[in-house]
From Swiss-Prot:
GO terms for biological process: ribosomal large subunit assembly. It holds the Pfam family Nop53. Residues 242-264 are annotated as: Disordered. Belongs to the NOP53 family. It comes from the Eukaryota. This is Ribosome biogenesis protein NOP53. Its main location: nucleus.
Length: 442
């Protein structure tokens, strides 16, 4: 370092200005370093500087003890291995159906025992029934059917019923049969294979052929006249046409008379006629479409002059007064539509209470309709099951005896009902079996 410059030391002010502050700065640095390092070591007590370990020494294991703690190979094989998956059960899984609810056990799964745990040996021939139902935690519950398994028949179906109950059951059986008859009669009629009709005689056929032939000739005559007029105009050497009108003549031949006239007027075909025959043909060609048209072509006027025979169209010019009148009418219509829309909105605001009443009434009707549907569905379930397959359940006919079949004794009873068929229909009605189509054997 360079040599410090000398300063004046006269007076107290000069002495104070040149006093060195290095000692103070060193002290502050030391105190800061001690605070960060945990305190001054020279002032710390001995207990904080040293630690006396008073714990006992662990005994040294001998070689024999270590050898005894080893697990043999045969023992390790018998213990459970957490990395090996369990053998799956051979029981098939139950298929879930619409009417089957599967409830799984919500108990927490037990953690698999570690390798060090001892395996528990169970007696295979013991009578311990503990945990017999705990092996399968899954339980199956089915919705109970509203229809009972064994239904009690009406008293009129008995082998010896009273007169009133027997008549009631006969009326019900007749109603079921008549319902089937009405269903077939009111259904759509089948498509008939043959249609009945009167044969035509030879004279009637002849008159029909003549009418068809005359209608065809009328159409052909009109088309021939139009085409001949166009061919004459095209083949005449004295006719001068514009270059763009050659294609128009081809189009005229394929069009109807009225369309041909319009096409000639639109394209402004310029024709110079030097002969009377050509002039007459042109007039006839232009007047073919005007038959029966009185006031349709008032705005469009066709003039054929003798000098040039030019075909022109005159249109009416729209004046400023007419345009101003149309603008005023348009603005008036627009204003009327706005006023009508405004009046409609005001009427809707005034009728707001009525609208709220209608909405409340509609909600009430919807709720009542939903309630009726639920009740009707429950009533239907009491009679027949829900549809499970392709075919609907068909209730068997009422097993009621006729008057001549009633004997009043079980010994003389006619064997008409079978228990197997009754049980089969009961299973279908309760929704246990899917209804199938009845196969008739001939």
């Amino acid at each position: 370092m360079g040599k410090r410059s000398k300063t004046s030391r006269k007076g107290k002010k000069a002495w104070r200005a040149n006093i060195s502050s290095e000692d103070i700065e060193d002290f502050f640095e030391k105190t800061t370093r001690d605070a960060l390092s945990g305190g001054n070591l020279s002032a710390a007590p001995s207990e904080d500087l040293f630690h006396v370990d008073k714990s006992h020494d662990l005994p040294v294991k001998r070689k024999i003890e270590k050898h005894r703690e080893r697990v043999l190979r045969v023992d390790s094989i018998l213990k459970k291995n957490p990395f090996v998956q369990l053998v799956p059960s051979s029981k098939p899984k139950l298929k879930k159906s619409k009417k089957t609810i599967v409830i799984e056990d919500k108990a927490p799964k037990q953690v698999q025992k570690s390798v060090g745990d001892d395996s528990v040996m169970a007696d295979l021939w013991g009578d311990d029934s503990k945990g017999e139902h705990e092996s399968n935690p899954r339980k199956i519950f089915k919705n109970p059917s509203i229809i009972s398994a064994v239904e009690i028949e009406h008293p009129g179906c008995s082998y010896n019923p009273t007169t009133e109950s027997h008549q009631d059951m006969l009326a019900e059986a007749v109603a079921q049969e008549m319902q089937k008859v009405y269903k077939t009669e009111l259904g759509p009629a089948p498509v008939p294979l043959t249609i009945e009709g009167d044969t035509l005689s030879e004279d009637e056929r002849y008159f029909l052929d003549v009418d068809n032939f005359s209608e065809g000739e009328d159409n052909e005559n009109v088309e021939n006249e139009v085409s001949e007029a166009g061919i004459k105009l095209k083949e005449n050497p004295f006719v001068q046409l514009k270059p763009s009108s050659n294609t128009n003549l081809k189009k005229i031949e394929d069009k109807t008379p009225r369309q041909a006239q319009k096409s000639v007027g639109d394209d402004s075909v310029m024709v110079d006629l030097l002969g009377d025959d050509i002039k007459e043909d042109l007039k006839y060609f232009l007047e073919v479409g005007n038959v029966g048209e009185g006031e349709d072509n008032k705005d469009v006027k066709i003039e054929v002059s003798e000098a040039g025979n030019n075909v022109s169209r005159k249109t009416k010019r729209v004046t400023r007064v007419e345009l101003n009148k149309r603008c005023r009418q348009k603005a008036l219509r627009k204003k009327e539509t706005k006023e009508k829309a405004k009046e409609k909105i005001l009427n809707e605001i005034d009728s707001l209470p009525n609208i709220l009443e209608e909405i409340a009434k509609e909600d009430e009707d919807k709720q009542n309709k939903h309630l009726r549907r639920v009740i009707a569905k429950q009533e239907v379930l009491k009679i027949r099951p829900p549809r499970l397959g392709k075919y609907k359940f068909e209730a068997p006919p009422v097993q009621v005896l006729l008057t001549e079949e009633m004997t009043g004794s079980l010994r003389k009873l006619k064997a008409c009902c079978t228990l197997a068929r009754d049980r089969f229909k009961s299973l279908e009605k309760r929704g246990i079996l899917v209804p199938s189509k009845q196969i008739r054997r001939f």
